[in-house]
């Protein structure tokens, strides 16, 4: 059993994770540190220091794994390792992660380098994909088939799988070839969640937010929301991994602190981070606050720190990543809206129905932004939302996708948009 993992960024060796006496460390290779185009594994582990200790690398690694204890326990049983040992888990699923990073054993590294790219893809039929989605709905830990060479990990609580889509074919990649799309089947009691997420992403784009492409795709009798990975791109005849990390990783926080109420970062801390690290700080701060406003308007209650990320690139470039995992709580009648809270406070207030003009003014002041400009932007977004939502509903239905959840969210968004405009006119 290995006690070292080689860290790769888009296929280049950048350092080593060491595991000794239940403690971790990460050391950058000198070759990577000397490269003028180098970028850090994490903003919490800058290139200026060659070695970083246990707390930093452990928090980063946990941030790559699912936020679901049951999934981790099942993975532990499957791989015969402790579900509480992040190093052992990553040893098995770290070959395709969020961002450009891969973690592989020294033995696997030699095979990976020597293996022809064409042998790294297991192509699937539509029936194969349907069966994988069916299995995943029944067993939320079945992100990959046991026989797959390629294993992957993504953060988040929802069951999902990741596949390569190329030349109109789906496949399971491994080694140097990354997954390009994330597939999420409908789950649990949230009927129409796949449609809800797809609709919310389209709505966000319509009001000027940057989001990945998405669609709801049917594979025989199974459906899934299919989201293009923004941390993948085609360049120079190959798939390129683009590095990213979520806000918890960037701030050296374990994923258990993703919610502000659990000690995680709130709006002000993320604004500070963007001002400290972003290559275009004011543009990214504005985009982030637009996202906060959007989630307030649609009642997107799960926009915690792990659902905001940073793109890390050459020459120290850092930018806010596209938004993802957007969804509205509005179409679910069993939810008591008087008790609904956001994942991050707005001007000191969590509760959705209590957030008004003075809270946005307080948030603007804490973010060192002109409050009139911020609030005018939110009003404009609220005013535009009902018509944009109706247009998207019509477009989606024209593409053959119809679900009561979409109709419900459109209907309730129209009412909520009017209510939010009134809240922004009254000082509460």
Positions of PLM-derived features:
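Phosphate/dinucleotide-binding and metal-coordinating scaffold of catalytic cores
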Residues: 1-428
């Amino acid at each position: 059993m290995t006690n070292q993992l080689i860290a790769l960024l888009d296929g280049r060796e950048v350092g080593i994770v060491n595991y000794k006496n239940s403690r971790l460390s990460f050391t950058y290779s000198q070759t990577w540190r000397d490269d003028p185009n180098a970028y850090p594994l994490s903003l919490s582990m800058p290139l200026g220091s060659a070695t970083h200790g246990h707390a930093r690398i452990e928090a980063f690694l946990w941030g790559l794994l699912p936020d679901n204890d049951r999934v981790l326990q099942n993975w532990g049983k499957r791989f015969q390792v402790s579900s509480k040992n992040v190093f052992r888990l990553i040893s098995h699923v770290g070959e395709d992660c969020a961002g450009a990073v891969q973690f592989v054993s020294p033995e696997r590294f030699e095979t990976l380098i020597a293996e022809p790219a064409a042998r790294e893809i297991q192509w699937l039929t539509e029936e194969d994909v349907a069966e994988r989605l069916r299995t995943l709905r029944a067993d939320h830990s079945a992100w990959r088939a046991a026989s797959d060479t390629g294993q992957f990990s993504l953060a988040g609580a929802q069951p999902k799988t990741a596949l390569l889509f190329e030349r109109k074919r789906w496949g399971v990649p491994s080694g140097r070839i990354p997954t390009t799309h994330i597939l999420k089947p409908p789950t649990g009691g949230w009927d129409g969640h796949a449609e809800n997420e797809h609709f919310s992403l389209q709505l966000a784009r319509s009001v000027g937010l940057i989001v990945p492409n998405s669609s709801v795709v049917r594979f025989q009798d199974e459906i899934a929301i299919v989201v293009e990975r923004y941390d993948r791109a085609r360049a120079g005849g190959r798939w390129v991994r683009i590095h990213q990390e979520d806000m918890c990783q960037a701030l050296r926080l374990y994923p258990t602190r993703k919610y502000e109420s659990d000690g995680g970062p709130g709006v002000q801390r993320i604004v500070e981070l963007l001002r400290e690290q972003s290559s275009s700080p004011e543009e990214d701060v504005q985009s982030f606050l637009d996202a906060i406003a959007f989630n307030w308007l649609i009642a997107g209650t799960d926009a915690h720190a792990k659902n905001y990320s940073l793109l890390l690139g050459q020459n120290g470039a850092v930018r806010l990543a596209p938004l993802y995992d957007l969804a509205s709580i509005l179409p679910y009648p069993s939810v008591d809206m008087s008790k609904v809270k956001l994942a991050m406070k707005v001007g000191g207030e969590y509760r959705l129905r209590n957030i008004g003009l003075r809270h946005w003014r307080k948030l603007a002041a804490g973010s060192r932004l002109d409050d009139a400009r911020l609030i005018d932007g939110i009003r404009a977004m609220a005013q535009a939302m009902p018509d944009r939502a109706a247009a998207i509903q019509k477009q989606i239905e024209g593409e053959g996708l119809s679900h009561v959840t979409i109709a419900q969210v459109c209907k309730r968004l129209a009412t909520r948009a009017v209510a939010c405009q009134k809240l922004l006119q009254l000082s509460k």
